[in-house]
Regions:
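ABC ATPase NBD Q-loop/coupling interface
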Residues: 72, 83-98, 243-245
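Conserved ABC transporter NBD signature motif
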Residues: 79-89, 136-140
Length: 265
């Protein structure tokens, strides 16, 4: 299946591994009122990678995603400082609807679907860009080919579907906007292990089609299994980063729980 990922200009400055990153976060800090939630977070994502961000509750993962998708720019008390770029465009000052236009979209925790609407109508919500509307009919058929179960239930309300099927709808909706980058937030939450395995197999398939993926996940085993690169967050900071082959499970576990000793970085 062709996911129809859009193309774009990359940065002129090489990043990790000497590659030109598609997504860069530099010196990102975030506050909710006086409470600081992120502390100078910096990392880059290369084109075509799956990067997994691991951390316990309260590590700052959700705030990171909110910052990357414009949600920290909505309220009066939440604010961010730093720089977020995708394909040469600044994201840190944009609201959510404008960020989607840059090719970045998200599959949110809890899926956030319209429960009374049909599968087809939920998918079409993702085709809200002018160029996407023109290819919506073709695109939705590609999504159905990718998720055959959705094709069988296209006219049924989402409320009648299982959690795994709803997760498929949420991923399909993200694909409808022709993304170059998809941010996945806690895909395993509330799902049976066998269903999660199927969902992550689909994430890898999406990635192989050319879509760059950033995966937020508490389940360390699954995050490592899908990732080309791993970031571990603790108390609003990135405390460990590297490829699964570079990092030992002991190091990752220690970083996750805050007991990692200095690695000499």
């Amino acid at each position: 299946m062709s996911i129809l990922a859009r193309k774009g200009n990359l940065f002129s400055k090489p990043g990790r591994g000497g590659q030109y990153p598609i997504l860069t976060v530099e010196g990102l800090s975030a506050w909710y009122g006086e409470l600081r939630a992120l502390f100078d977070v910096s990392f880059s994502v290369n084109p075509g990678e799956v990067v997994s961000v691991i951390g316990a509750n309260g590590a700052g993962k959700s705030t990171l995603l909110k910052a990357m998708t414009g949600m920290m720019n909505r309220g009066r008390t939440a604010r961010i400082e730093g720089r977020i770029e995708c394909q040469g465009r600044r994201l840190d000052k944009l609201r959510t609807e404008k960020i989607v236009e840059t090719g970045v979209t998200m599959v949110p925790e809890g899926r956030m679907l319209f429960q009374r609407m049909t599968v087809a109508d939920n998918l079409l919500v993702g085709a809200h860009l002018p160029h996407a509307r023109q290819v919506a009919a073709e695109k939705i058929e590609e999504v159905y080919a990718f998720f055959p179960r959705l094709a069988e239930r296209r006219n049924q309300p989402v409320s009648q579907m299982s959690g795994g099927e709803q997760q498929m709808v949420a991923i399909g909706r993200a694909l409808m906007s022709l993304p170059s980058v998809i941010l996945f937030d806690e895909l395993s939450l509330g799902l049976a292990p066998i269903v999660v395995d199927d969902i992550y197999a689909k994430v890898r398939e999406i990635n192989r089609s050319g879509v760059t993926c950033l995966v937020i996940e508490q389940d360390t085993r699954r995050a490592l299994a899908v990732a080309d690169h791993v970031l571990v967050m603790l108390e609003g900071r990135v405390v460990l980063d590297g490829s699964p082959s570079e990092l030992s499970r002991e190091e990752i576990t220690a970083a996750y729980f805050g007991t990692l000793k200095n690695r000499g970085h």
